[in-house]
């Protein structure tokens, strides 16, 4: 039996949170800092020394020896440089532990050593990290010691954003301002601030670490590049919500405890659809905290797995033939007075503010579907989206029967008179309670689904930061809110104007609503008839960043400059090309050094067996050995030819000038060549004696953990 955990006692114990600040900061300093955190007012630099001292004292008391400016560069993972608290020794050789206000507020790093898309040249190395006081500092405790992590933004010497956090904070300010205007239009003048709230559901795989270390593809790329399906996959539907095995449960227990100590509100855990696949979901938080905490979740998942002899796979498609992993981004808008803008109430047809918000979101998603699709573009997601396991690459909105009925009433007659209800769930069993059903069902095939009081963006990849998706969501909805507020604030008759605006937006953007099965070919054809984009792969989605539409959208709200968008497009092309090249080279390495030599050894055994049987008994039937030897040899020849083709494709693609051209060449030429190499290898795995196969099979990986 494991020891009981007092969650309330340990929650946030490693976080410099509001409780700690209130205890340790002078009252006037605390009030000024709290004002900045809660209301978004400008940070007063004069309080930095007092905050730094209190933060250092708390950290040292908890065993910390170092601090770091913890930031999120455009690599998609976090970065940190550790400095000790030690100051210069005095004449007696003793040292004092220091953290100055300047060291808290500003750090410096090499801006050219991170992806910058040309914003930083090698000789222009200076980059700055700036303290984000809206996200609490925390202690990272592991085998390396205890480190005070100070969340920061990361920018170039000229102020260009080189990270994920800065644009997110900009977008939050943008939607805050415009959403407050919407509230005020409806007389809710007490609202002073609106914050996007996010709850990212994190899917992941766990495999045995010893087996993981035997596969170069998992080590180098995070996914398997070869592998035949075992006799059983996920077809029995017995893993989803199944009993959590003890080894996995012990991992989840330790993971939860680590996260709770770091103030991450880990809430739900369960087995997912694929064997060895699981999910962790947190409680909703402010968007910037949710983004930071999701990075902490992914890092902690890997650390805890390693300690327990496991490996955590966050790749979108670690195993071909079973479901991949995503990260559902649940998004809503909450006022400082406790109102959720996406709550339709019991009678949505009478909730005019909600209908306006809904119409604006429909407009935003329809007009900027390309940007929303691009925000979920990472190389691994190409293998997941539209594969009967995840939403299609076509952006559409699911609103459910109740809301769709209200929309239909407004579009057809100009007014809505009623809202459908869910009714009672009647089980027919006396001892089971009857209860009210939700007003609508769920649709797991939709990329952007309304689920009662929030929207769930389901396209985000499991390894990806949720920052970019929320940057796009916040900004495109801010634009729609602004245009609506501009029109309504100038109206002579508000009631008539808002009614006409809602109807107009619903009619103009009705095409984005789809409540059907997004997995079918019929939807692909229907979407084309509606004029909806189908950006099937990452490289096709990247150009959406550098359109005049995107420049104007992000520029108007100060979220990205034109230069920042162009840099991000270049970084995306480069990331895709590098990812594909690493995978291709890994396949070449595994095929040339492991699979082909193993198959040759096996064919020698077959040939020797054939010769021995013929010599011992000439009349014996050796057709099985002969057929197996011929089939194995033919596949070996096919594999060697495919290997040579892949090697040649890598060379020709590397010669392409420009990252855009190189990325497209990788998708058009290298990816198909990789598939051509994998096909004979996977067939050989089904023929070759397991004792000769050079690495663990799918069955070994996903069923033996």
Where are the regions a protein language model picked out?
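Hydrophobic/aromatic-rich, well-ordered segments within soluble, folded domains that form packed cores
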Residues: 64, 68-72, 291-307, 333, ...
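Active-site core of metal-dependent hydrolases
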Residues: 10-124
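Short, intrinsically disordered, low-complexity segments enriched in Ser/Thr and Pro
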Residues: 88-122, 237, 360-362, 484-493, ...
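Conserved active-site and cofactor/substrate-binding residues in soluble primary-metabolism enzymes
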Residues: 20, 24-31, 50-54, 62, ...
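Glycine-rich, acidic/polar active-site loops that bind/position phosphate-bearing ligands
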Residues: 125-314, 323-326, 333-570
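Basic/polar N-terminal segments that are highly enriched at the extreme N-terminus
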Residues: 1-9, 704-705
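Active-site proximal loops enriched in glycine and acidic residues that flank catalytic Cys/His/Asp
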Residues: 47, 71, 100, 282, ...
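C-terminal amphipathic alpha-helical interaction region
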Residues: 502, 507-705
């Amino acid at each position: 039996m494991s020891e009981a955990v007092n969650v309330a006692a340990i929650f946030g114990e490693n976080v410099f949170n509001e409780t700690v600040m209130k205890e340790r900061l002078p009252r006037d300093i605390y009030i000024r800092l709290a004002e900045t955190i809660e209301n978004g007012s400008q940070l007063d630099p004069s309080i930095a020394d007092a905050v730094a001292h209190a933060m250092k004292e708390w950290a040292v008391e908890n065993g910390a020896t170092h601090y770091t400016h913890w930031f999120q560069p455009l690599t998609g993972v976090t970065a940190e440089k550790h400095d000790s608290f030690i100051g210069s020794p005095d004449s007696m050789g003793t040292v004092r532990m220091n953290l100055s206000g300047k060291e808290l507020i500003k750090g410096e790093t090499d801006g050219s050593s991170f992806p910058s898309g040309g914003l930083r040249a090698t000789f222009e190395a200076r980059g700055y990290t700036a303290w984000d006081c809206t996200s609490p500092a925390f202690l990272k405790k592991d085998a390396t010691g205890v480190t005070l992590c100070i969340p920061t933004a990361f920018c170039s010497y000229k102020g260009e954003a080189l990270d994920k956090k800065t644009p997110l904070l900009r977008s939050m300010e943008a939607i805050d301002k415009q959403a407050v205007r919407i509230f005020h239009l409806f007389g809710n003048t007490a609202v002073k601030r609106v914050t996007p709230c996010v709850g990212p559901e994190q899917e992941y795989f766990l495999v045995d670490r010893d087996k993981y270390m035997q596969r170069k593809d998992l080590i180098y790329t995070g996914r398997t590049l070869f592998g035949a399906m075992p006799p059983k996959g996920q077809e029995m539907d017995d893993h989803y919500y199944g009993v959590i095995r003890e080894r996995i449960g012990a991992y989840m227990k330790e993971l939860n405890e680590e996260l709770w100590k770091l103030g991450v509100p880990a809430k739900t855990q369960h087995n997912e659809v694929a064997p060895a696949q699981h999910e962790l979901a947190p409680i909703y938080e402010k968007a910037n905290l949710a983004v930071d905490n999701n990075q902490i979740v992914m890092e902690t998942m890997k650390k805890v797995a390693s300690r327990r002899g496991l490996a955590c796979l966050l790749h979108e498609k670690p195993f071909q033939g079973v479901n991949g992993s995503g990260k559902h981004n649940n998004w809503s808008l909450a006022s400082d007075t406790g109102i959720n803008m996406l709550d339709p109430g019991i009678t949505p047809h009478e909730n005019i503010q909600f209908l306006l918000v809904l119409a604006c979101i429909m407009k935003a998603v329809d007009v900027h579907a390309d940007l929303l699709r691009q925000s979920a573009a990472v190389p691994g997601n190409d293998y997941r989206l539209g594969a009967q396991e995840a939403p299609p690459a076509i952006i559409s909105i699911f609103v459910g029967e109740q809301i769709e009925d209200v929309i239909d009433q407004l579009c057809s007659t100009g007014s809505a008179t009623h809202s459908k209800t869910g009714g009672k769930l009647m089980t027919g069993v006396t001892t089971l309670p009857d209860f009210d059903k939700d007003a609508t069902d769920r649709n797991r095939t939709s990329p952007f689904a309304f689920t009662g009081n929030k929207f769930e963006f389901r396209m985000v990849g499991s390894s990806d930061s949720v920052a970019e998706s929320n940057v796009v969501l916040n900004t495109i909805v801010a634009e729609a809110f602004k245009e609506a507020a501009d029109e309504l604030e100038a109206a002579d008759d508000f009631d008539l104007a808002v009614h006409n605006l809602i109807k107009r937006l619903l009619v103009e953007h009705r095409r984005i609503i789809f409540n059907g099965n997004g997995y079918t070919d019929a939807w692909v054809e229907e979407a084309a008839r509606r004029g909806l984009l189908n950006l099937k792969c990452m490289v096709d989605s990247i150009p959406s960043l550098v359109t005049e539409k995107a420049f104007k959208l992000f520029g108007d709200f100060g979220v990205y400059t034109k230069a920042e968008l162009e840099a991000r497009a270049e970084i995306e092309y480069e990331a895709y090309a590098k990812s594909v090249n690493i995978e291709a080279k890994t396949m070449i390495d595994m095929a040339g050094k492991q699979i082909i030599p193993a198959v040759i050894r096996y064919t020698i055994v077959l040939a020797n067996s054939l010769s021995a049987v013929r010599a011992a008994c000439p009349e014996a039937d050796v057709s099985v050995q002969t057929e197996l030897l011929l089939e194995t040899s033919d596949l070996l020849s096919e594999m060697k030819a495919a290997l040579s083709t892949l090697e040649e494709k890598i060379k020709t693609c590397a010669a392409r000038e420009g990252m855009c051209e190189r990325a497209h060449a990788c998708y058009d030429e290298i990816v198909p060549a990789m598939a051509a190499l994998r096909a004979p290898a996977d067939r050989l795995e089904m023929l070759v004696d397991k004792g000769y196969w050079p690495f663990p099979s799918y069955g070994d990986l996903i069923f033996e953990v």
